[in-house]
Amino acid sequence: MTHFSTIGLIGHLNNERAVYSIERLIRFLQQRGKDFVLEVETAARISDIALTQAARQIMDMDALGQICDLVIVVGGDGSLLSGARALAKYQVPLLGVNRGRLGFLTDITPEQIEQKMAEVLTGQFASEKRFLLDMEVRRDGQVIALADALNDVVLHTGQFIHMLEFEIHVDGSFVTSQRSDGLIVSTPTGSTAYSLSGGGPILHPKLDAIVIVPMNPHTLSSRPIVVSGDSEILLMVGEHNRALPMVTCDGHSHAEVQTGDEIIIRKKPQLLELLHPLDYNFYERCRSKLGWGGHLLKPE
């Protein structure tokens, strides 16, 4: 049976429903006699002083990642993405409680908190490894920006609506030059997010692959490409861009790039471990979240 000795709690700061669910989690962990720590900004949102005082410690994200053997993220998919980027380097597993809208990554619903947490604490869960992307921007051979992403790295025009010109290279080989609104480089995790909206394929989370999705390309033959998860992708910004392009990781970590800059994207060495309830099923998740069709005939 898996034993989690120290459990970290992180919540969406601007979501009162998330705060309420964290308070429920604290009471549940207290009843089970479990040590828990609170992320410092999360603790500041809890009005019941007795609950924050019950925490073993209140600490920042890095310290939390170093001492916890399980971190519960309460919020939407964005909250889990933020937690993943901050904690992947510490190899601490994450479990999501959904207080957002879609909930592709946050499995446990609010009404299931006590039941599903009891199962997890007794070892009844499924574990899954997901990879992140490392992104760096080089200018004249010098690294000027670094970031990582669980979902996607996006090259785009920022606030201006202009075509971008750039080249795509994979593993040192020139692939194509492109004029488009931008490019999405996505993990399997991100393939059900922005990449999907851009016409990219859905990749099963266990696939070791990266998908490259053009955004409104000027050439109709420019289609999404799936490459090996071990590939190094290089984007080179062209000369004839009327606006300074931007690079975004999971919707955050903006970096402004200019002519001649190189954007290098590769798999992050550290994998993220996600925990799921035992009844988790990726295809069921797609059906329920994306509105896929059910059985034509009810199973007997």
Curated annotation (Swiss-Prot):
Q: Nucleotide-binding among the record's keywords? A: yes
Q: What does this protein do?
A: Involved in the regulation of the intracellular balance of NAD and NADP, and is a key enzyme in the biosynthesis of NADP. Catalyzes specifically the phosphorylation on 2'-hydroxyl of the adenosine moiety of NAD to yield NADP.
Q: Which InterPro entries match?
A: ATP-NAD_kinase_N (IPR017438), ATP-NAD_kinase_PpnK-typ_C (IPR017437), NAD/diacylglycerol_kinase_sf (IPR016064), NADK (IPR002504)
Listed binding positions for NAD(+) are D77, G78, N151, D152, H162, R179, D181, T192, A193, Y194, S195, L196, S197
Give the family per the record: Belongs to the NAD kinase family.
NCBIfam families linked:
PRK01231.1
| Keyword vocabulary terms for this entry | ATP-binding, Cytoplasm, Kinase, NAD, NADP, Nucleotide-binding, Transferase
Taxonomic lineage from the root = Bacteria, Pseudomonadati, Pseudomonadota, Gammaproteobacteria, Cellvibrionales
EC number(s) recorded for this UniProt protein: 2.7.1.23
| Protein name, entry field | NAD kinase
Which GO cellular component terms, listed alphabetically, does the Swiss-Prot or TrEMBL entry include? Answer: cytoplasm
Extract the GO molecular function terms from the UniProt entry.
ATP binding; metal ion binding; NAD binding; NAD+ kinase activity
